[in-house]
Design a protein with these regions (language model features):
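Short alpha-helical DNA-recognition segment
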Residues: 17-37, 52
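DNA major-groove recognition helix of helix-turn-helix/homeodomain DNA-binding modules
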Residues: 28, 48-63
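Residues that mark the N-terminal boundary/hinge immediately upstream of a DNA-recognition element
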Residues: 8, 19, 46-49, 60
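A short, Lys/Arg-rich alpha-helix, primarily the initiator
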Residues: 1-15
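Recognition helix of helix-turn-helix/homeodomain-like DNA-binding domains
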Residues: 28-45, 66-70
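Interfacial/linker helices and their anchor residues that mediate assembly or domain coupling
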Residues: 69-107
């Protein structure tokens, strides 16, 4: 079973369209080490290896330590949506809540 870090690493690698081999090359790590990070419970990379992975994937190393598993792009979209929502007039907010509740009922 993978760790939260392993899940994040796997998702981000897939979103970037990278194979284990290509990410290993970019980060200067072995393919087998990356596989273990993604798929094993007990792996704890050093700060240097975590930084190399973050650099290769174009994220801050702190991304791997955060609880939120969503990719940075998805989090930014959610934050932008919320900022836009906060600027709406009360009537528009109510309409949007009704629309969202319809989606929730249908899912």
């Amino acid at each position: 079973m993978a760790t939260r870090l392993g899940e994040k690493l796997h998702e981000l690698r897939k979103q970037r369209g990278l194979t284990l081999e290509k990410l290993a090359e970019l980060a200067g790590l072995s393919k087998s080490y990356l596989w273990e990070l993604e798929d094993r419970e007990s792996q704890r990379p050093s700060a240097e290896k975590l930084t190399a992975l973050a650099d290769a994937l174009g994220v801050a190393a702190s991304y791997f330590l955060e609880e939120d598993i969503r990719a940075p792009e998805e989090r930014h979209l959610d934050e932008a949506f919320f900022r836009g929502y906060q600027k709406l007039e009360p009537d528009a907010k109510e309409q949007l809540r009704k629309i969202l509740s319809t989606f929730k009922k249908n899912s």
